[in-house]
């Protein structure tokens, strides 16, 4: 059992939940249910600065190392780029899409970022933006899903490929170079669709050809993704699946996928309502099969853990949840 090497309560406000934890080189940034976010020193967990009320409800936060920044999005339809070097005194750039509640965000290595939206006026859309410009969005796709977008991730090697997940139970692969509504079938941006059958919590590339999917009902599967020889069509097949991870892992909920120091594996973090522990199960990124991991984190309360992140370089886990505590665990 690993106990916390340092802990900090992120706010004096009642019911201030930690939503997400993102890592920078020397810092971690944390978003809250109050619409605020803070930057902490990785080693000491001392708060360096706080951005109060950055959004009405902050729904996504990602690091942008190329610009020494952080990008956030919110349910009020705003996106902001913040400069860490100036302690985020004000947003460096902002983007707005009227009446579009953003739900999630992802960044590629070409300084482009994607956002997903709630179902609004019968449309659940995915947008592509240029982080270097406040001009209008590059592209928007409305046909990939028919309910709230819940998760986005760019391919680890191909910056033009975007994986999207939704409440509709579908995981879609988009070519972000292509426009929607093209009359040429070969120019269709929707390359492939996986029907997982339940609202998507997580849809993530764990390698170039493997996609892990986890639903809000805790159903789990690993899919092999294949580009056919003509390089115009894609296919997938399920390698491994579990109907309910709660029964398999004897837990109450699954938190998220986290990196490991071994590239053959990633891990799933999970918790239980009846104790303080956060546990892990290793996932073979080639087969999707699960392997027991002995590491356990003893958190400071029994409140639900909402976010966890692993610093591979320094062997430190960062966790946070509905107790409002940010904790570091050195393993």
UniProtKB/Swiss-Prot annotation:
Keywords: Cytoplasm, Nucleus, Repeat, WD repeat. The keyword Nucleus applies. It comes from the Eukaryota. GO terms for cellular component: cytosol; nucleus. It is found in: Cytoplasm; Nucleus. Its main location: cytoplasm. PROSITE patterns: WD_REPEATS_2, WD_REPEATS_REGION. WD repeats lie at residues 53-92, 97-139, 144-184, 300-331. This is Uncharacterized WD repeat-containing protein C63.06.
């Amino acid at each position: 059992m690993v106990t916390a090497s340092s802990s900090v309560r992120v706010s004096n406000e009642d019911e201030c939940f930690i939503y997400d934890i993102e890592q920078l080189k020397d810092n971690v940034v944390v978003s809250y249910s109050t619409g605020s976010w803070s930057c902490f020193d990785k080693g000491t967990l001392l708060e360096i600065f706080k951005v109060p009320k950055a959004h009405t409800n902050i729904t996504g936060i990602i690091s942008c190392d190329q610009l020494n920044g952080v990008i956030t999005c919110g349910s009020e339809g705003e996106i902001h780029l913040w400069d860490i070097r100036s302690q985020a005194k004000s947003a460096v750039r902002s983007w707005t899409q009227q009446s579009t509640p953003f739900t999630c965000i992802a960044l590629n290595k070409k300084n482009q970022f994607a956002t997903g939206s709630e179902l609004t006026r019968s449309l659940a859309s995915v947008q592509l933006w240029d982080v270097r410009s406040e001009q209008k969005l590059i592209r928007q796709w409305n046909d990939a899903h028919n309910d709230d977008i819940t998760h986005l991730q760019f391919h680890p090697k191909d910056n033009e490929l975007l994986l999207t997940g939704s409440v509709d139970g579908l995981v879609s692969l988009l070519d972000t170079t292509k426009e929607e509504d093209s009359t040429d079938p070969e120019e269709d941006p929707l390359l492939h669709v996986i029907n997982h059958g339940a609202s998507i919590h997580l849809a993530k590339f764990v390698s170039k050809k493997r996609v892990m999917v986890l639903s809000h009902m805790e159903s789990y599967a690993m899919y092999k993704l294949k580009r056919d020889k003509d390089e115009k069509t894609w296919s997938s097949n399920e390698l491994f699946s579990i109907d309910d991870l709660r029964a398999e892992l004897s837990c109450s909920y699954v938190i998220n996928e986290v990196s490991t120091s071994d590239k053959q594996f990633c891990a799933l973090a999970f918790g239980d309502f009846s104790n303080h522990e956060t546990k892990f199960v290793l996932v073979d990124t080639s087969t999707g099969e699960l392997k027991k991991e002995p590491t356990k984190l003893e958190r400071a309360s029994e409140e639900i853990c909402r976010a966890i992140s692993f610093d591979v370089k320094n062997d430190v886990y960062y966790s946070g949840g509905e107790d409002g505590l940010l904790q570091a665990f050195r393993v």
